[in-house]
Amino acid sequence: MGFDVAGYLQSYSLKDWIRIIVYVGGYMLIRPYLMKLGAKIQEREHRKSLLEGEVDGTLDPEMTHGTKPKEHGEFDTDDEEEEENPDAEFRWGYSARRRIRKQREEYFKNQDKSPLDAYADDDEDIEEHLED
C-alpha cells in the first residue's frame, strides 16, 4: 500500500516537466531580488522603530500593559491607582502585583507596632504568681 514514485514520475508528460522546470527556475532567478526587497523593507521598519523608541526590536514591557512608563525608583507593585485597562493586550503578573502590594501594606502596618508592646500584657499574667 505504498506510493509508487517511479510510476508517478513516468506518468508526467514533456509538458508537465517543462512546467516544473519553469517554476523552479523562475523561483531561483527571482528569489535573490525578493530577499533584497525584504531586507530593505525590514531595514526601513527597524529604523522607524528605533526612532519611535523601541530598542533592538523589543517592545517596552509597559506598552503591553497599556500604562505609562515608571520613573526611576518607582515599583510596579506600588501603583495603587492602577485600573483595569480594556485596551491592554496583556495582563501578566497583575495578581502577583496585587498580592505583593497587600503584603507590603501589612508589613508597614505592623512596623508601626513595637515588639515590646506585644509583651506588655504578659506582665499581668505573671503578677498573680509573684510574691511581694
Curated annotation (Swiss-Prot):
Xref: InterPro entries: Trafficking_Pga2
Cellular compartment(s): Endoplasmic reticulum membrane; Nucleus membrane
Major localization listed first in the record, in broad terms: endoplasmic reticulum
Coiled coil location: none
Transmembrane annotation, as ranges: 17-34
Keyword Flavoprotein: no
Example of a GO cellular component annotation carried by this entry: endoplasmic reticulum membrane
Acidic residues bias (residue ranges): 76-87, 119-132
Swiss-Prot/TrEMBL keywords: Endoplasmic reticulum, Membrane, Nucleus, Phosphoprotein, Transmembrane, Transmembrane helix
Modified residues (Phosphothreonine): 77
Membrane topology according to the record: Single-pass membrane protein
Classification via Pfam families: PGA2 (PF07543)
Biased composition (Basic and acidic residues): 62-75, 106-115
UniProt-annotated stretches for the region Disordered: 50-90, 106-132
One record GO biological process: protein transport
Family: Belongs to the PGA2 family.
Function: Involved processing and trafficking glycosylated proteins.
Name of the protein described by the UniProt record: PGA2-homolog C27.01c
Organism ancestry: Eukaryota, Fungi, Dikarya, Ascomycota, Taphrinomycotina
